[in-house]
Structures are given as structure tokens and as C-alpha cells.
Amino acid sequence: MDQAEYFHSWCRQDEMMLNLLEKCPTQQIQRLPLPIRRLEKKQEIQKMLEARREDYHKAMEGVAREWEKLQEKEAEIRVGLEKYKKSIVKNDKKQERAFRDAAKARSMCIQYDLQLKALQEQCEELDKKRAKTKAQVQKYEKCHRYLEKVVKASEKFQSIPELMSQFHALVSYLPQEEQEEQKSQESRSQRIHCMEEKSDSIVQFSNEIHRLYIRLEKAKKKRREWELRWNQMLKTATRKNLLLGTIKAAVRDIFQTVISQGLGSNSVGEDDIVEQLEIIRKDIEDLTDIWEKLSLNEELMEPIRAPLLPTDKTLGHPPSQ
């Protein structure tokens, strides 16, 4: 038999004993043994515990209700706190707006004060101008009466404004007349100045023409001189060309004579005068050396016939063709 079964059996015995005690009177209960009395006390304690448990449950239910109420109040407080925060933010914004409005109002007051001072100064200036105009009106009142008399006396004008408009038209026309007169004087002075400049330029051009004419005469004179020089140069060149042709013909004759005697080479061209003269010079030097040698040995050797050289008479004639 385990403990659970023992406990259940003991509980059943206790219940049976309690039922018997309820059926027995109180005098008999006092005579009951100690275990029964203990069981009775235990039952009383259980009843007290159950009563306290019920009180505890009731108290917990009340606490739960109070807790719900507290949560509702907390939610209400939170909502109120949010509203309070929003109201604080709104109040801050309103305060800032009020500060800005106050600053604007102060600046507007300052501007209005400045405008008021400016208007006061303008009023003072207008008062001064009014006093001046009043003095001028009093001053020119005689003129007004005089103009009225003039209008009455004249048949052309019907009122003072008409007379004044005519007067202003004439006054405005006078500067135009002065300007036109000034323009005409300026144009006249410009024309005179232009004529003077033209006359000066004409004199300068005439002087320049005279100077150029003198230069032209000098150039013509120089041209004639250079023409004379050119003619002289042509004559001199012609004469020198003739002399050069004569010299060339003489050189050619001498060269032909030297070639005919076999003293030079025939490979030189007919127009190469320089080579021909060089060959003639060499031949003359050779003949001179030979002649000197022969003159030294004249007594020992037979007379040698020297080659015939061209005479002065044949120098100026060209060779026979």
C-alpha cells in the first residue's frame, strides 16, 4: 500500500469521523478521544483557510478591479499628459508667435515713429512753402490786378490764362529763335572756316604743283644728260668692240702663222682667244730662248734661219679666207 492510497484512506476516515461528530451532541464530543478532537480542529482550520482563501480571492478580485481602474486612470493620465504636452507645445508656439508679433510690432512702431517724424518734417516744410507761397501771392497780387486791367483793355484776349498762355508760348519760342540764330552763326563760321581751310589747301596744292614741276624739269634735264652719257657709252662700246674684233683677228692671224709653222697644237678652238694668246706667248718665249742661245754660239754654228714672224703690217688684217 503506497502513501497516496494511505492518504486517501485516512482522508475518508476523517470524513466519516466528522460526519459522526456532527451527528453526536456537544457533550459527547468533549468526551471524544484526542485524535477526533485533533481532526475537528483540523477541520476548523481548513474552514478558516477556506474562508481566508475566499477572502483572498475576493480581495484579489477587488485588487484586479482596482488595478483595472488604475490602468484606466493611467491611460486617462497618459492621454491627459499627451494633451498637456501638446498644449505646452502649442503654448510655446503661441509664445514664439507672440514674441515675433511683439518684435514686428516694435519694428512697426519704430517705422511708424520714423514715418511720423518724416511726416512732421514734411508738414513743417509744407508750412514753410505755404508761407512762401502766401508771401508770393501777396507780392504778385498787384501783377494780377494789372493783368485783369490788361485783359479788360485788350480785345484780343478774353481771360488771364489765355494771355499767360500766349506769353509762355512767346517765351518758349525765344530760346528756339536763339538756338536757330546760334546754329546759323555756327554754320556761317564753319563755312568761313572751311573756305579758309580750302584756300590754304589750294595754296598748299599750288606750291606742291610748282615744286613737282621744278622736280620734273630737273628730272628731264637729268634724263637728257643720261641720254648723252648713254650715247657716249654706246659709241665707246662700239669703238671698243671694233678694236676687240681687230685684236681678235690679229691674234687669230698670229695663231694661224704659229700653227702653219708647226710650233703649236691645232686643238684650240677658233673663238678661244685666251688659249691662242697663251700658245703664242709660249712659242715666243721658246723662240726667244732659242735666239739667245744662237746669238751666243753665232761664230761656231751656221746661221739658222729664224721662223718668219708676222710684221706690224699684217697685225691689223684678218687672214685670207
Swiss-Prot record:
**One GO term of the cellular component aspect?**
cytoskeleton
Keyword set, alphabetical order:
Coiled coil
- State the Pfam families in the record: DUF4200
Which InterPro entries does the record match to this protein? CFAP_domain-containing, DUF4200
Coiled-coil positions are 36-144, 202-229
Tell me which domain of life the UniProt entry assigns to the organism this sequence originates from.
Eukaryota
Q: Which family does it belong to?
A: Belongs to the CFAP73 family.
Q: What is this protein called?
A: Coiled-coil domain-containing protein 42-like 1
Organism, scientific name: Xenopus laevis (African clawed frog)
